[in-house]
Amino acid sequence: SVLLKEEIKLLLQEASNLMTNPDDKRGILIEGHTDNQDPKGKIAERYPTNWELSSARAANVVNYLIFKGVMSGRLTASGYADRWPSGATWSEVRSGKVDDMVIGDKNSNPEQRTNNRRIKIIFGVK
């Protein structure tokens, strides 16, 4: 789903308090991720692939943070679909070591798929 659950909103509210510090000008990247299962049912009508779904997740978080007072110019949304499973490092993804076989292995049970349906918030360097 792309809808923000109440517990996520509470967490983002706390995080937004840190992100609204006027002295902090770092960029903030919001990453959306999915498992390797294609969207189904009603969600597939709006988000036919995991690329659209992961991008929409990230965009919803960005919109919520802007609503909470974070400067929009600091925020970037990016969707990764299933291409960056939980536990894979930046260098593994960038070097091509995370291929369809690895992605399948990292989505082989419900717990792994749940872990892969996530948002990451990354702060730039000061």
Give the predicted meaning of each segment.
Residues S1-D23, H33-K126:
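Periplasmic OmpA-like peptidoglycan-binding domain that tethers envelope proteins to the cell wall
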